[in-house]
Amino acid sequence: MNNLKIMGNPLPDMPWEERPAASREIMWRCSANPIIPRDLLATSNSIFNSAVVPFKKGKYNYAGVFRCDDTNIRMRLHVGFSADGLKWDILEEDIRLEGADPEVGTWVYGYDPRVVKIEDKYYVTWCNGYHGDPTIGVAWTDDFQTFHQLENAFLPYNRNGVLFP
């Protein structure tokens, strides 16, 4: 357990909390949870933060794609930015996906987003409602403003896909 090695670029300003004393867990939660309040947005019932990456934009050092359920529990994806990885500015509007064939791009629901940087693009995967069934949606962005939707991956009936660089 003492031989952990993190592969990737250093992130010296990433928030970190040491493992609690006497804990043997591989992963542990921040003692300040929840980091993002469930009702941060005017219409949100709950917000889930599973897709954050380092991203420099003005005062911000991090960008993320968040599942934000509204008060009718409609699952939507929203973009957020943070200077410190703890205090987040999440945009009120949900992500608008561009470029997909209308049959693929019709929004039903989306949840459990993941983001990975591959070369000069950030790829987002999420559980995408496609004709009422779950599949893996895929889109890319280079600025966290415009998202280009690609074909759904692994039809039918898949969810929680992730790309590894």
What would you call each of these model-derived segments?
Residues 1-108, 116-165:
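Beta-rich carbohydrate-recognition and catalytic domains
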